[in-house]
Every structure is written in structure tokens, then in C-alpha cells.
Amino acid sequence: MKKQAELYRGKAKTVYSTDNPDLLVLEFRNDTSAGDGARIEQFDRKGMVNNKFNHFIMSKLAEAGIPTQMEALLSDTECLVKKLDMVPVECVVRNRAAGSLVKRLGIEEGIELNPPLFDLFLKNDAMHDPMVNDSYCETFGWVSKENLARMRELTYKANDVLKKLFDDAGLILVDFKLEFGLFKGEVVLGDEFSPDGSRLWDKNTLDKMDKDRFRQSLGGLIEAYEEVAHRLGVKLD
């Protein structure tokens, strides 16, 4: 497998083609963004931590029967993934109230949500990822009813797997987002799972161990990411 041209450069990752039309190289950079890319800073080791963290989580989800795009870890900051036809809608599961939900409904941060909430957002930075629903997806042809149902099913299944994984590590999985795509007609989990796209709190102190440390200028971002990885048993070095 040979890495070729840069195809896409996002806020924190770069995608490259390979000599295999079904495979891509996903590179995790040290960039960290907030406000849909309005604020960007670089943190040493972040690309490495997120790459290895993502590979670890995707492996756990694959073991649980969730199809993922992950193929192999290539280096400290790169992994080999299937080339997906990405769905332009992301799935969010909320186990506790935080972030935009608190602002939107005026509820207390941290209250438990039982059953968990499931939200859909259109992936569009310029419009700040507006919330949408099943009806929008059908009307605008973003994803079929069948594939959306499968995305919802896999998201809830991932939540069951990951809640226990993090709980066993002394962490609360507050919420997270997942992105899906199609590979040869099958719904497959793509993009990444890392503290960039999830909220993780310490069970005892409720300290935030995710990108909210950057969003809210709390400091200690990489230290928190590495602590989460350490608790899970992710091998970083």
C-alpha cells in the first residue's frame, strides 16, 4: 500500500488516497479547533494520542460486531481505513446533559438522561451543524430510511459498549458523536472516536477529560487525553 495525493484536509485530520481505490490513509494532526474552526491551536502529541485512541476504540467496537472502516494502524499519526461514501449527517448520543443541550433547553448540566437522547446534525461548519431529524433526511435525500435506522441501531449499540468500557476505567461517557458511510452498500462506522468528539468526565471528581478543556480554556488538554488513554489501556509509546 502506497500513500498518494492529499484528498481532504479537515480541522484536525488529513485524508490521502492510496494505490488501492478502496483504501485511504487518515492522518491525525496536532491541530485542535473550537467554534467550528474559528479558533485553532496546536498541541504536541495530540495527533499521536488521538490516532492510537481511535484505533483502540474502533477495535473494541469491531469486536462487538459493529462494522468500522478501520483496517490498520500505520504509524504514530496515521491509520489505514476503508474509503466510505460518507453520510452528511452525524449521530449524537447523550447520556447526560451537557453542551448545546443545556443551552437549548436551559437544563442543569450533568443530569442523567434515561433513556439516552439521540440527535442528528447536518455536517456543515458554515451553518454550525444544524440539528435535523428523520424527515429532513428523507426529504433531502441525505440517507435512506433503512440506512438511517441502521445508523441509529449501531449508535445505540456503540453506546452500550462504550459506556461500560469507560465506566470500568472510572469515567462517565457523557455524550459523543459518530459518523457513518457506505462501503459496498453496507453502513459502516467512519471518521473517529476520540476525546475530540466525545465528553468524558471523571466519575469521582466530574473533572472534564475531553475537548471541553480547550473550548472552556481549562488547560491540561493533552494531559487529560493521555490520562483517559492510560486508564483504558491504550498503548501510546
Curated annotation (Swiss-Prot):
It holds the Pfam family SAICAR_synt. It is an enzyme of class 6 (ligase). The keyword Ubl conjugation does not apply. CDD domains: SAICAR_synt_PurC. Its EC number is 6.3.2.6. One of its GO terms (biological process) is 'de novo' IMP biosynthetic process. Keywords: ATP-binding, Ligase, Nucleotide-binding, Purine biosynthesis. GO terms for molecular function: ATP binding; phosphoribosylaminoimidazolesuccinocarboxamide synthase activity. It catalyses: 5-amino-1-(5-phospho-D-ribosyl)imidazole-4-carboxylate + L-aspartate + ATP = (2S)-2-[5-amino-1-(5-phospho-beta-D-ribosyl)imidazole-4-carboxamido]succinate + ADP + phosphate + 2 H(+). This is Phosphoribosylaminoimidazole-succinocarboxamide synthase. It comes from Klebsiella pneumoniae subsp. pneumoniae (strain ATCC 700721 / MGH 78578). The gene is purC.
